């Protein structure tokens, strides 16, 4: 078995993901977004806020300015799922030009399960130890026998492009794979999902680590809006408009008024006499006495003013 590079993340029994190179990061995203009026930012917090705005409103082009290039090694059946993401540039190990290597994927016992009765593309349930051992034995037997025949044909001078056809899809291949951040996040969103096949999920999770390291603000925004955020259909929104009591909306709006006030005060500290009028300006309804009790509790969290105001508008549109 060939050695896994020291700077790579091992995936499955013999595979890996290695970040070869990257171009740009969070700074490249904001640079591209601001080019229309040629103005930079002086604060890191402003860069973070802009990236979050871009992600929230799905302005994808600035994220395409960041590039990642990986060296990956995976079973062929994983590569065939992977290659469906057609925006990438790929150069794969050629079995027409080069000889195959005796490297085959054999699943660990804990990942051998039954076919799911609910998901035609999934697995479920607990398999007996005897059956797990039999599955592993079959994997090894077919792998060994197919490679033995392949080697025999190869030694007899049969064309490699033909001899390779008898090799099973658990044979390992490798490639260089390059993509931009926007499409890489789309890949991760699909392939790190709990419904994705385990064997490709481990590669996606490994790639996610490098994204988090290279573009931490973009990764944070992706987690907040793409992974953990919710979007409602027209039908779902109509249900909310009819069923969500106004008193619940008013309570949330009141919390937002406090959060906006706290955020504005954090960004630009005000005197004590200015804080309550600032809160009232944000639509707050509490009396000055009640406001002071809540404000002095220290439990009010700051956020992003733009996000909070957009959320406020959405909530107000739901009021009956």
Segments and roles (model prediction):
Residues 1-320:
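Family-specific signature for flavin-dependent thymidylate synthase
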């Amino acid at each position: 078995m060939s050695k896994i590079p020291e700077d790579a993340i091992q995936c499955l029994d013999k595979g890996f993901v290695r970040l070869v190179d990257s171009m740009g990061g969070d700074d490249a995203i904001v640079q591209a977004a601001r080019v229309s009026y040629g103005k930079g930012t002086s604060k890191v917090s402003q860069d973070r806020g802009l990236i979050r705005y871009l992600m929230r409103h799905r302005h994808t082009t600035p994220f395409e300015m960041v590039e990642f290039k990986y060296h990956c090694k995976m079973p062929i059946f994983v590569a065939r799922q992977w290659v469906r993401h057609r925006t990438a540039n790929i150069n794969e190990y050629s079995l027409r030009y080069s000889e195959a290597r005796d490297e085959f994927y054999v699943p660990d016992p804990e990942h051998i399960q039954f076919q799911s009765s609910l998901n035609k593309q999934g697995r479920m349930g607990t398999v007996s130890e005897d059956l797990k051992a039999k599955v592993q034995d079959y994997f090894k037997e077919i792998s060994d026998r197919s490679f033995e025949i392949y080697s025999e044909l190869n030694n007899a001078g049969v064309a490699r492009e033909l001899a390779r056809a008898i090799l099973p899809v658990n044979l390992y291949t490798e490639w260089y794979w390059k993509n931009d951040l926007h499409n890489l996040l789309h890949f991760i969103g699909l392939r790190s999902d709990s419904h994705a096949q385990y064997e490709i999920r481990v590669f996606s999770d490994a790639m996610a680590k490098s994204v988090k390291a290279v573009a931490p603000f973009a990764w944070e925004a992706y987690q907040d809006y793409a992974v953990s955020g919710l979007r409602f259909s027209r039908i779902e929104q109509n249900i909310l408009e009819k069923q969500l009591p106004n008193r619940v909306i008013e309570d949330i709006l009141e919390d937002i008024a406090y959060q906006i006030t706290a955020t504005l005060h954090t960004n630009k500290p005000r005197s004590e006499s200015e804080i309550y009028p600032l809160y009232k300006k944000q639509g707050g309804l509490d009396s000055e006495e009640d406001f002071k009790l809540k404000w002095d509790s220290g439990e009010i969290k700051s956020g992003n003013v733009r996000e909070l105001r957009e959320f406020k508008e959405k909530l107000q549109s739901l009021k009956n």
